[in-house]
């Protein structure tokens, strides 16, 4: 850790310093070996100092996931600001924002949607952040249903299907990015699944739009969506 980073502790920012260090550790080494004591050594503070902010390792991971949901919700909110006027365009922008967040913040994304933390209920801030984030998607879908632009038996099922679709795209994008970074000489053109994965990475916006085509029932909205992504 640099002198500047160490200095942040003395200004009362140890909590954020530990969170940044945890992301760096997970990105470089995975979660194995991650502990509050190890992070304390990296921050140059006493082994007990992190416990003033986090009860245990799981609490620290929950804080990272909470931060992630709040960041994602901000991006989804910005993407869907025009949802009342055009729910379909807003849904596409929201889906693209979701995928882009996953691509640029894979550590937090895996904590948010993986099973490392487990039950969210002991962490009220995490639970609230996750529900607020999902509420952004639900609001746009509800507007689309109300305006007769989207098909779906009910809001809950439509939400699950839409989330699953975009989540799948995000997973492929993360995997393709990782392979490109760690295996640059991999003969992707000779491996059909990896070639398909790369195509999604090259144009996630088009992938989101094509999946949305299955739930958009308004011809005008569908045509506008295709024009927006150069797909028609």
Can you annotate each of these PLM segments?
Residues 2, 134-147, 171, 175-232:
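C-terminal peripheral helix-coil segments that are non-catalytic and often amphipathic
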Residues 14-22, 39, 64-68, 72, ...:
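Generic hydrophobic, amphipathic alpha-helix propensity
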Residues 26, 61-68, 112:
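Alpha-helical DNA-contacting segments of helix-turn-helix folds
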Residues 100-101, 107-139, 185:
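Short secondary-structure transition hinges
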Residues 67-91, 122-131, 140-142, 146, ...:
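Amphipathic alpha-helical linker/stalk segments
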Residues 17, 28-59, 63:
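Helix-turn-helix
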Residues 77-108, 159-162:
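Hydrophobic alpha-helical connector segments
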């Amino acid at each position: 850790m640099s002198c500047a980073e160490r200095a942040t502790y003395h200004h009362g920012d140890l909590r954020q310093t530990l969170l940044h260090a945890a992301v760096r550790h997970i990105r470089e080494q995975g979660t194995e070996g991650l502990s509050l004591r190890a992070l304390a050594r990296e921050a140059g503070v006493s082994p007990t100092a992190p416990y003033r902010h986090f009860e245990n390792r799981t609490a620290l991971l929950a804080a990272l996931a909470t931060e992630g949901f709040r960041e994602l919700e901000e991006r989804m909110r910005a993407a869907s600001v025009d949802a009342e006027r055009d729910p379909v365009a807003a849904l596409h922008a929201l889906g693209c924002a979701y995928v882009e967040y996953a691509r640029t913040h894979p550590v937090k994304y895996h904590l948010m949607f993986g099973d490392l933390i487990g039950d969210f209920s002991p962490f009220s801030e995490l639970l609230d952040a996750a529900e607020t984030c999902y509420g952004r998607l639900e609001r746009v879908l509800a507007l689309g249903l109300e305006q007769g632009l989207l098909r779906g038996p009910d809001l809950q099922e439509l939400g699950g299907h839409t989330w699953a679709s975009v989540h799948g795209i995000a997973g492929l994008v993360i995997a393709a990015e990782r392979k490109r970074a760690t295996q640059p000489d991999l003969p992707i053109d000779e491996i059909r699944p990896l070639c398909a994965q790369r195509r999604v990475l090259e144009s996630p916006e088009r992938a989101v739009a094509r999946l949305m085509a299955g739930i958009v029932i308004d011809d005008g909205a569908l045509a506008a969506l295709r024009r927006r992504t150069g797909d028609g």
